[in-house]
Every structure is written in structure tokens, then in C-alpha cells.
Amino acid sequence: MKIMVIQGPNLNMLGMREPNIYGRMKLEDIHKQMQSVADQAGTEIEFFQSNFEGEIVDKIQECVGTADGIIINPAAYTHTSIAIHDAILAVSLPTIEVHISNPARREDYRKTSLIAPVTAGQIIGFGPIGYHLAMMGMLQIFEQIKAIKTANKGE
């Protein structure tokens, strides 16, 4: 099984950008922790970050046939991108949305996610550990898919 982790705009600035909101952990450190969890679970993982909406849409589309699930932090595109929403819907892969901060506690324009309706769930406001929680959630989804496939073989 393979997880694609997609990081949206400005997440490459973690550790420097608004540490009072996002903390001091760098994106590379978050990815190292996720890689460790994936290694322990025997799961492949790939990381992608872009500040450009079209590149994120392209990466989501490339997941067809190459990934089994997506963990995405669409960052500011959460509130504006119908294109990312539609791409996730089109690929029909289990997707978990992650946010380091809690958008509901921030500006009004951050309170609505256009992405949430096409995801298996959201993990928000737990800081960088939210990515670990998303990994646990995705691994559980993989186990459920495996169990369903096994049960269907027995029919």
C-alpha cells in the first residue's frame, strides 16, 4: 500500500512562518516522522509540496494507479479550490485532510473547507502531530479495505 502526502502553499515555510500558529517544526521533520511510521507499518509513502494549485491537482490525478490513499494539507486552498475538491472526487481514493492549526478558531474566511466533503475525515488543530494521527487513520482505512477484499473473496 502507498500513501501520497500532498502539502499546499506556504507549508515549505514551516518552522519560520507564524510559529505562534504553526509551531517551529519544519516540513522536512514532519515528513521524517511520517516516513518512520510508514516504515514501521511496511507502507510506502511519497511527499509532495507545491505553492501552485494546478500542480496539486496534477499530483492528485497522478495518484490513480500509483497510490492507495492521500493525506493532504491544502493550506489556503482549503477555502477556495473547487479544482482540488473535484480532483479528489475524481480519483476516488481515501483522502484525509490535515491542518496544523484549527481554521475554525481563525479568520471567518478560513472556517469553510471546500475539501472536507470529499474526504474520509479531517484532523485539525493538533499541530504537527496531526500528521501522525492522519497516518494512523489511513493505515486503519487500509486495514478495512483489506478486510473487505478478503471477505469478498470468500463469497
UniProtKB/Swiss-Prot annotation:
List the residue(s) that the UniProt entry marks as the site Transition state stabilizer.
Answer: R17
Name the residues annotated as catalytic in the UniProt entry.
Answer: Y22 (proton acceptor), H99 (proton donor)
Q: Known catalysed reaction(s)?
A: 3-dehydroquinate = 3-dehydroshikimate + H2O
Q: Which GO terms describe its molecular function?
A: 3-dehydroquinate dehydratase activity
- Gene3D superfamilies in UniProt: Dehydroquinase, class II (3.40.50.9100)
Question: Some GO term, biological process aspect, for this entry: which one?
Answer: quinate catabolic process
Q: Copy the pathway line from the protein's UniProt record.
A: Metabolic intermediate biosynthesis; chorismate biosynthesis; chorismate from D-erythrose 4-phosphate and phosphoenolpyruvate: step 3/7
- Describe the subunit structure: Homododecamer.
Name the HAMAP family on file.
AroQ
**What's the name of the protein?**
3-dehydroquinate dehydratase
Which gene is this protein's source?
aroQ
